UniProtKB/Swiss-Prot annotation:
<dbReference type="InterPro" id="IPR020548">
    <property type="entry name" value="Fructose_bisphosphatase_AS"/>
</dbReference>
<dbReference type="GO" id="GO:0030388">
    <property type="term" value="P:fructose 1,6-bisphosphate metabolic process"/>
</dbReference>
<feature type="binding site">
    <location>
        <position position="111"/>
    </location>
    <ligand>
        <name>Mg(2+) 1</name>
    </ligand>
</feature>
<keyword id="KW-0119">Carbohydrate metabolism</keyword>
<comment type="similarity">
    <text>Belongs to the FBPase class 1 family.</text>
</comment>
<feature type="binding site">
    <location>
        <begin position="112"/>
        <end position="115"/>
    </location>
    <ligand>
        <name>substrate</name>
    </ligand>
</feature>
<dbReference type="Pfam" id="PF00316">
    <property type="entry name" value="FBPase"/>
</dbReference>
<feature type="binding site">
    <location>
        <position position="90"/>
    </location>
    <ligand>
        <name>Mg(2+) 1</name>
    </ligand>
</feature>
<keyword id="KW-0963">Cytoplasm</keyword>
<feature type="binding site">
    <location>
        <position position="112"/>
    </location>
    <ligand>
        <name>Mg(2+) 2</name>
    </ligand>
</feature>
<keyword id="KW-0378">Hydrolase</keyword>
<comment type="subunit">
    <text>Homotetramer.</text>
</comment>
<dbReference type="GO" id="GO:0042132">
    <property type="term" value="F:fructose 1,6-bisphosphate 1-phosphatase activity"/>
</dbReference>
<dbReference type="GO" id="GO:0005986">
    <property type="term" value="P:sucrose biosynthetic process"/>
</dbReference>
<protein>
    <recommendedName>
        <fullName>Fructose-1,6-bisphosphatase class 1 2</fullName>
        <ecNumber>3.1.3.11</ecNumber>
    </recommendedName>
</protein>
<dbReference type="GO" id="GO:0000287">
    <property type="term" value="F:magnesium ion binding"/>
</dbReference>
<dbReference type="GO" id="GO:0006094">
    <property type="term" value="P:gluconeogenesis"/>
</dbReference>
C-alpha cells in the first residue's frame, strides 16, 4: 500500500459536496490536529511537566490527571470554531451547547487510560460524531447506530488514528516529520474467529456465571469444547486492546460484576462503548453487553456505564449464547467444566 494518501485527502474524497458530510470532515480534521498536539505532550512525558499524578477527581468520580485536563482543553480549542452544536466530554459533568443549529455534535474521551501514563503504556483519545436532533440537548440520547463517524487515537510507539465514517475502517499513522496522518491500513477486517482474549482475570470471583464459563472454556484450550489453545492479553488500555483486535482479532471483555459500582461495567456508553462498537462492527466484528447489541442502546444519561464485549464476531456470539442460552444454568463452581457441566460431551 502507498502511504502517500493523507487523512485530509481521504476526508475530502469521502465528504463530497454534502454539507453534513463536510461538517464531519472538518470535525475529524480538527480532532486529528488536536491528536498531534496531545501526542507531542505524551511523547515528552516528564519533560513536558507530565507526572501522572492525580489532580483530583472528575465529575464521575474517576481520578483525574493533569494530562486529562490539558488534553480536554486542546480538543475543545480545536473544535471551538467549527459548526458543532454540542460538545460532550468525559471530563465534564454537563453538555457544552455551542451552536444549537449546527448539524453535528461531538462526544469525546480526551485521554483514555491516563492512569497508565507513569508506566509508559499506550493511552488514547476516543470520539463519536452524532447528527444534531431538533433539540440539540438530546444529541447524545440517540442509539449508537445513529453515529456519523467514530474514531480513536493510540499514542504508542506510533501515533495511530483509527476512523470510520460508516463505510469501513481505516488506519492512519502520524508522520512526525511532516506532521500529518497518512493512510497505512484500509478497509480493515477483523478475523471472524481468533484465539486471544483480554480480561482482568483477577476479578473472576465477581463475574456473572456466563463470563466465568466462557473464560474457563478458553483456559481449557484444546482439551475443551473449542478445541483450540488461547492466549490471554490484558493491557489495561481500551484503545490499545481495540487496536490489537483490529489488527489480529480476538475478544475484549469488560463485563459488569458483583462489586458495588460495577454492576453495569465501568466503560461509558457515549464516550467509549458507542464509538468502539461502531468501529468494531464496521470492521466485521461484534460488540455487545452479552445480552444486547451496543449500538442499539439508547443512553439514559450522559455518563451511563455499560458492560462491553467486543471483537471477532464468532467469539462474541459464543459469549452471547452463554448469556441467553441453556448454559446459564451451569453450576457456578464446576471446576473449568472439565468433568461436569454442559460443555463436556
Amino acid at each position: 500500500m502507498s502511504h502517500e494518501l493523507t487523512l485530509q485527502q481521504r476526508l475530502e474524497v469521502q465528504a463530497g459536496p454534502d454539507p453534513l458530510h463536510r461538517a464531519v470532515k472538518e470535525a475529524v480534521a480538527a480532532l486529528a490536529q488536536a491528536a498531534i498536539d496531545i501526542s507531542d505532550l505524551t511523547c515528552r512525558g516528564a519533560l513536558a511537566g507530565i507526572t501522572g499524578e492525580a489532580q483530583g477527581r472528575n465529575t464521575d468520580g474517576d481520578i483525574q490527571k493533569d494530562l486529562d485536563v490539558r488534553a480536554d482543553q486542546i480538543i475543545r480549542d480545536a473544535l471551538s470554531a467549527l459548526p458543532i452544536a454540542v460538545l460532550a466530554s468525559e471530563e465534564m459533568a454537563e453538555l457544552d451547547i455551542l451552536n444549537p443549529g449546527a448539524p453535528i455534535s461531538v462526544a469525546f474521551d480526551p485521554l483514555d487510560g491516563s492512569s497508565n501514563i507513569n508506566t509508559n503504556i499506550s493511552v488514547g483519545t476516543i470520539f463519536s460524531i452524532m447528527p444534531t436532533p431538533p433539540d440539540a440537548s438530546a444529541a447524545f440520547t440517540q442509539p449508537g447506530s445513529a453515529q456519523l463517524a467514530a474514531g480513536f487515537v493510540v499514542y504508542g510507539p506510533q501515533t495511530s488514528l483509527i476512523l470510520t465514517l460508516g463505510q469501513g475502517v481505516d488506519i492512519f499513522t502520524l508522520d512526525r516529520v511532516e506532521r500529518v496522518f497518512k493512510l497505512t491500513g484500509s478497509m480493515m477486517q477483523i478475523p471472524a474467529d481468533a484465539t486471544e482474549f483480554a480480561i482482568n482475570t483477577s476479578n473472576r470471583r465477581h463475574w456473572d456465571l456466563p463470563v466465568r464459563a466462557y473464560i474457563d472454556e478458553c483456559l481449557m484450550g484444546a482439551d475443551g469444547p473449542s478445541g483450540k489453545n488461547f492466549n490471554m492479553r490484558w493491557i489495561g488500555s481500551l484503545v490499545a486492546e481495540a487496536f490489537r483486535i483490529l489488527v489480529r482479532g480476538g475478544i475484549f471483555l469488560y463485563p459488569g460484576d458483583a462489586r458495588d459500582g460495577y454492576e453495569d461495567g465501568r466503560l461509558r456508553l457515549v464516550y467509549e462503548a458507542h464509538p468502539m462498537a461502531f468501529i468494531i462492527e464496521q470492521a466485521g466484528g461484534g460488540a455487545s453487553t452479552g445480552r444486547k447489541r451496543i449500538l442499539d442502546i439508547v443512553p439514559g444519561s450522559l455518563h451511563q456505564r455499560v458492560p462491553l464485549i467486543m471483537g471477532s464476531i464468532k467469539n462474541v456470539r459464543r459469549l452471547e449464547d452463554m448469556h441467553t442460552g441453556p448454559n446459564v444454568a451451569l453450576e457456578a463452581n464446576a471446576p473449568l467444566f472439565g468433568h461436569r457441566g454442559l460443555f463436556r460431551v
